[in-house]
Amino acid sequence: MQFLSLNLLLLLPFVAGDLAPQPEPLRAGPSDVVPGQYIVTLKEGLSSAQIRDHKKWVNSVHRANLDSFAAGASGVETEGIMKHFHIHNLNMYSGGFDEKTAEELSRNPYVKSVHPDQHVYLAKTVTQPQARWGLGYMSSKGKPVPLHSTLVDYLYDDKAGEGVWAYVLDTGINVNHVEFEGRGILGHNAIPNKPHTDEFGHGTYVAGIIAGKTYGVAKKANVVSAKAFDTGSSTYNYILETYDWIVRNITDSNRKNKAVINLSISGAKYQPFDDAVENAFKAGITTVVAAGNDGKDAKNNTPASSPNAITVGAVRWENTRPSFSNYGKIVDIWAPGELIKSCWKGSNTATSTQSGTSAASPHVAGLVAYLMSFENLPSPSAVTARVLNLTIPNLVKDAKDSPNRVVYNGIQERKFTLPKDY
């Protein structure tokens, strides 16, 4: 293997103070609930025949209640079972039901839980003037990185994510962007009547941090577009469909040890999706998630609260926590998340500089892809242990009660000749 050094010229017209993206909600209020739509989780251990019989029962109850109470006249969605999700040992379905049917479902002996569907939000970002300090930070062992007109080396192994797939559950990816060099793949589009493109920009931006030739941590990795958002929000009906597709695609393609999922999304605590991420972990699949941008404890957010996801908070170039970044004991690691330049919407060469934990999470997802390309990491537990073992401790100012560990790619410990004075 060879070792590579990428010189990054950091140009910024001015230094802004702490950025403050609009916060995502911590709890599901009335505006977050999707009226008449539910996510039903079944108990583990049911046979295929039991699940089939249960769904027949659901359909009969739903039809009877529609006939008895004319639920469809209320304008609430009551179309019955909509989509089915199977992630490892977890069986779920979404559906449009009247309240009486939902109550009957909750009492069924095969049902673990019935939750109203909710809106979920992209971990929001703030646009600022262009900068590229984040990559240099990845190989600097947490050494503060100058922001103004300064050359910073990003040092990395030339395997650089080769032969690894990063799945981006987001707004889609412009796979034709020059940064992806043909490594972008259109995977799944859950949004009905919308093309599999990225008109919002967020997914392309995230993918560029993972695997862009200029802006990416893992410059040779493949990025797979899994579109569950069309704008800044979506629902678990689409998100679970997309996450289910990702897990099946990774499993069917026999690439569990060569794949990572990035979720730069955030919403109120939602146990059904935390359960989905946990079951993907049990199935052998690594998921990296944003801590969220509320400036509060990430334990109240999903998917940040998923116990076996890698939860990522944002750090600034001088090792301070931006005021927007969530924190707490659930945060595993800190990564660059302010003034990060990457790909953008609008053209195949467009770029944008943004801030938020949406930028921090793909730095770590990129690191996972990078390490998978040349290390034997046989399980998500091994991946997490390796990523955390490489971190540099006790550098983040105002980390509150979070584990104080900043991201590092381990290059200085590898047997290479480093540049003088690095």
Swiss-Prot record:
GO terms for biological process: proteolysis. Its main location: secreted. Pfam families: Inhibitor_I9, Peptidase_S8. Residues 18-123 form a propeptide. PROSITE patterns: SUBTILASE, SUBTILASE_ASP, SUBTILASE_HIS, SUBTILASE_SER. Residues 132-422 form the Peptidase S8 domain. Keywords: Glycoprotein, Hydrolase, Protease, Secreted, Serine protease, Signal, Virulence, Zymogen. GO terms for cellular component: extracellular region. It is found in: Secreted. Its EC number is 3.4.21.-. Residues 37-123 form the Inhibitor I9 domain. Residues 1-17 form the signal peptide. It is an enzyme of class 3 (hydrolase). The active site is at D170 (charge relay system), H202 (charge relay system), S358 (charge relay system). Glycans are attached at N249, N262, N389. GO terms for molecular function: serine-type endopeptidase activity. Belongs to the peptidase S8 family. Secreted subtilisin-like serine protease with keratinolytic activity that contributes to pathogenicity. This is Subtilisin-like protease 2. It comes from Arthroderma gypseum (strain ATCC MYA-4604 / CBS 118893). The gene is SUB2.
